From Swiss-Prot:
Homodimer. One of its GO terms (biological process) is tRNA pseudouridine synthesis. Formation of pseudouridine at positions 38, 39 and 40 in the anticodon stem and loop of transfer RNAs. SUPFAM superfamilies: Pseudouridine synthase (SSF55120). It catalyses: uridine(38/39/40) in tRNA = pseudouridine(38/39/40) in tRNA. Belongs to the tRNA pseudouridine synthase TruA family. InterPro entries: PsdUridine_synth_cat_dom_sf, PsdUridine_synth_TruA, PsdUridine_synth_TruA_a/b_dom, PsdUridine_synth_TruA_C, TruA/RsuA/RluB/E/F_N. It is an enzyme of class 5 (isomerase). This is tRNA pseudouridine synthase A. It comes from Listeria innocua serovar 6a (strain ATCC BAA-680 / CLIP 11262). Its EC number is 5.4.99.12. The active site is at residue 53. CDD domains: PseudoU_synth_EcTruA. Disulfide bonds: none annotated.
């Protein structure tokens, strides 16, 4: 039995998230369906670094699976690329140590959120970015983001549906990239993220850029440990990308 590590990307627009769910199209289900065919009807379970929600994309999701097939990692990659749908891509497949774990072995992740600042709505980017035709003060967004860096209890910045007992996470950095006059990308790097955390942080920073909230409001929200104390909305899913997963 050999363990394999794969880095995959996918367009989340046509999926009801990553995780298998009854009677819905998910990333996990499509990959496991392909592996089952390769293993002549035998079920093969995959494990990912984490789940993504409906409409959320991935540029560098990491999965692992075990197989008894006597084929090279390169052939696995080629076969899975052919046997999975067009909205999933296998960037790499390699043999991994038997104790490698895509989920529990992570030491950090990077998410990016893409914002289109065009005055006129672009239908061709609607599934891949948030359309935000309002003025933004990037300097204010950067000032607000500084209050979020470091180790904090992020209860106020995650969904009430979060299943984790501890809401303490460390944000290493929040960077802002103006790729062009119309595109703003916010990159979040941390040791882990809670359910809807990046989307709530994005909504908060957009409010800061509009002058609706101040850096002090963010500090108060962090200390309140209560999502209801934060007025910012959760940014929609289509602008969010799981960009990279780090391991030791």
């Amino acid at each position: 039995m050999t363990r394999y590590k794969a880095i995959i990307s996918y367009d989340g627009s046509g999926f009801f998230g990553y995780q298998v769910q009854p009677n819905t199209r998910t990333v996990q289900a499509e990959i496991e369906k392909a592996l089952e065919k390769m293993h002549k009807g035998k079920s093969v379970r995959i494990t990912a670094s984490g789940r993504t929600d409906t409409g959320v994309h991935a540029k560098g999701q990491v999965i692992h699976f075990d197989s008894e097939l006597d084929i090279t990692a390169e052939k696995f990659q080629k076969a899975l690329q052919v046997m999975t749908p067009f909205d999933i891509s296998f960037l790499t497949v390699e043999e991994a140590p038997a104790d490698f774990h895509a989920r529990f072995g992570t030491v950090g992740k990077e998410y990016r959120y893409v914002i289109k600042r065009t005055k006129i709505f672009d239908p061709f980017s609607r599934n891949f970015a948030l359309h935000y035709p309002y003025e933004l003060d990037i300097a204010k967004m950067k000032q607000a983001s500084e209050r979020l860096i470091g180790e904090h209890d992020f209860t106020s910045f995650c969904s009430a549906r979060t299943e984790r007992d501890s809401k303490v996470r460390t944000l290493y950095s929040i960077d802002f990239y103006e790729e062009d006059a119309e595109t703003l990308v916010i990159a979040f790097q941390g040791n882990g993220f809670l359910y809807n955390m990046v989307r709530i942080l994005t909504g908060t920073l957009l409010d800061a850029g509009q002058g609706r909230i101040s850096p002090d409001d963010i500090t108060k929200a962090l200390l309140a440990h209560d999502r209801q104390k934060l007025i910012s909305k959760t940014a929609p899913p289509q602008g969010l990308y799981l960009w990279r997963v780090d391991y030791e």
